[in-house]
UniProtKB/Swiss-Prot annotation:
PROSITE patterns hit by this protein: GATA_ZN_FINGER_1, GATA_ZN_FINGER_2
Upper lineage: Eukaryota, Metazoa, Chordata, Craniata, Vertebrata
Reported disease: Immunodeficiency 21: An immunodeficiency disease characterized by profoundly decreased or absent monocytes, B-lymphocytes, natural killer lymphocytes, and circulating and tissue dendritic cells, with little or no effect on T-cell numbers. Clinical features of DCML include susceptibility to disseminated non-tuberculous mycobacterial infections, papillomavirus infections, opportunistic fungal infections, and pulmonary alveolar proteinosis. Lymphedema, primary, with myelodysplasia: A chronic disabling condition characterized by swelling of the extremities due to altered lymphatic flow, associated with myelodysplasia. Patients with lymphedema suffer from recurrent local infections, and physical impairment.
Protein name stated in the entry: Endothelial transcription factor GATA-2
Assembly: Interacts with BRD3. Interacts with AR and CCAR1. Interacts with MDFIC.
Function: Transcriptional activator which regulates endothelin-1 gene expression in endothelial cells. Binds to the consensus sequence 5'-AGATAG-3'.
Organism: Homo sapiens
Cross-linked residues, Glycyl lysine isopeptide (Lys-Gly) (interchain with G-Cter in SUMO2): 389
Tissue and organ expression note: Endothelial cells.
Gene transcribed to yield this protein: GATA2
Length: 480
């Protein structure tokens, strides 16, 4: 299917282009419950176009750029197949959500033929809405169509609620099931004056539906905020609207920004920070569980690891290991230590006749010799001369090797660093994070975007935009 140049092009809608097609307006479409005086000025529609840029749509700095965008060459207006269909931005004929919806559809079909309205790829939106015009963006509010009124005010009427609720699909709300009502063939003809007379009653009915739907949306958000993944959504339904022109819409305030330092980041998760918050609790729990235990072998009440013997009785770590290795209980009485070689009574050196030495050795004949005489004989194969005998035992101070010096110095530096980190607050500590996150808590309410994260800024600034043809990336995004 090819779209002829004379047919409406992409985004060529009177609500978006400041009502350049006055013949497409009809009194039957005047069922919007917002007054024109409450609408935003056209300059603030820039926020909505910034949101559309994150979804693959072209970004326009002001309505003048939007009007200039439609003047691209007819060669670029040929769209093959349904690949450029934007079902969540363009209206679909199968939306029997409201009583006045069929009249709006019939009036739109009679005055403005748009091939998008019969696209087989269109699908129902997440929230009920009435069409503000053929191919116009769907409004999240029931009956918040932007077809009535002239100028850019009507475009804001339909664009602002859409931008406010565009990210609500992130919350996982199931769509409201549509009523099993097929479009009445009697109302699909040309629009009649009866549609304009029914506009007032439809507006009153849609006001009630809007209030009911908003209450259900607030309750759904409260139920959603009960989950552990979204603790900051509990205040969404209770915050008064301060920035949005519609007083009944709850503005989004990032309440979870104040809890970043305590709930999202653990103080011990960074280098040099204190131990994690759950370690003292686990230690106290382990100590409380181990209280009252006693080793059945040695009677010890404190041990790094409690073990059990074959009968299930508690053993300390030492007794348990001894029993495991030797197969018998660990002896309670320490064996007498063997007398050291230096303190052997009655032993004297066969060479120098000394009785004190650090180590007793034996010569080739098997006679005991002192350490000095034994080493001398081992090195020179001659007995040590008696002139070298000294009364005191000479010990030398061994020089530390470079490896041992480096290892010792590294250990000392690490200890000093850990002490400094514990004394002073780390830059990654909870206090520092709270200080950095403090400006986040004072952000203005997100009244134009329902995303949890702020909308990313466009890659190209608005001043350098070229209005020749849309970027291929937006076309690829449109397929999804």
């Amino acid at each position: 299917m090819e779209v002829a140049p004379e047919q409406p092009r992409w985004m060529a809608h009177p609500a978006v282009l400041n009502a350049q097609h006055p013949d497409s307006h009809h009194p039957g479409l005047a069922h919007n419950y917002m007054e024109p005086a409450q609408l935003l000025p056209p300059d603030e529609v820039d926020v909505f176009f910034n949101h559309l840029d994150s979804q693959g749509n072209p970004y326009y700095a002001n309505p003048a750029h939007a009007r200039a965008r439609v003047s691209y060459s007819p060669a670029h207006a040929r769209l093959t197949g349904g690949q450029m269909c934007r079902p969540h931005l363009l209206h679909s004929p199968g939306l029997p959500w409201l009583d006045g919806g069929k009249a709006a559809l019939s009036a739109a079909a009679a005055h403005h033929h748009n091939p998008w309205t019969v696209s087989p790829f269109s699908k129902t939106p997440l929230h009920p809405s009435a069409a503000g015009g053929p191919g116009g963006p769907l409004s999240v509010y029931p009956g918040a169509g932007g077809g009535s009124g002239g100028g850019s005010g009507s475009s804001v009427a339909s664009l602002t609620p859409t931008a406010a609720h565009s990210g609500s699909h992130l919350f996982g709300f199931p769509p409201t099931p549509p009523k099993e009502v097929s479009p009445d063939p009697s109302t699909t003809g040309a629009a009649s004056p009866a549609s304009s007379s029914a506009g007032g009653s439809a507006a009153r009915g849609e006001d009630k539906d809007g209030v009911k739907y908003q209450v259900s949306l607030t309750e759904s958000m409260k139920m959603e905020s009960g989950s552990p993944l979204r603790p900051g959504l509990a205040t969404m339904g209770t915050q008064p609207a301060t920035h949005h022109p519609i007083p009944t819409y709850p503005s989004y305030v990032p309440a979870a920004a104040h809890d970043y330092s305590s709930g999202l980041f653990h103080p011990g998760g960074f280098l040099g920070g204190p131990a994690s918050s759950f370690t003292p609790k686990q230690r106290s729990k382990a100590r409380s569980c181990s209280e009252g235990r006693e080793c059945v072998n040695c009677g010890a009440t404190a041990t790094p690891l409690w073990r059990r013997d074959g009968t299930g009785h508690y053993l300390c770590n030492a007794c348990g290991l001894y029993h495991k290795m030797n197969g018998q209980n660990r002896p309670l009485i320490k064996p007498k230590r063997r007398l050291s070689a230096a303190r052997r009574a009655g032993t004297c050196c066969a060479n120098c006749q000394t009785t004190t030495t650090t180590l007793w050795r034996r010569n080739a004949n098997g006679d005991p010799v002192c350490n000095a005489c034994g080493l001398y004989y081992k090195l020179h194969n001659v007995n040590r001369p008696l002139t070298m005998k000294k009364e005191g035992i000479q010990t030398r101070n061994r020089k530390m090797s470079n490896k041992s010096k480096k290892s010792k110095k590294g250990a000392e530096c690490f200890e000093e660093l850990s002490k400094c980190m514990q004394e002073k607050s780390s830059p990654f500590s909870a206090a520092a994070l709270a200080g950095h996150m403090a400006p986040v808590g004072h952000l203005p309410p997100f009244s134009h975007s329902g995303h949890i994260l702020p909308t990313p800024t466009p890659i190209h600034p608005s001043s350098s935009l070229s209005f020749g043809h849309p970027h291929p990336s937006s076309m690829v995004t449109a397929m999804g």
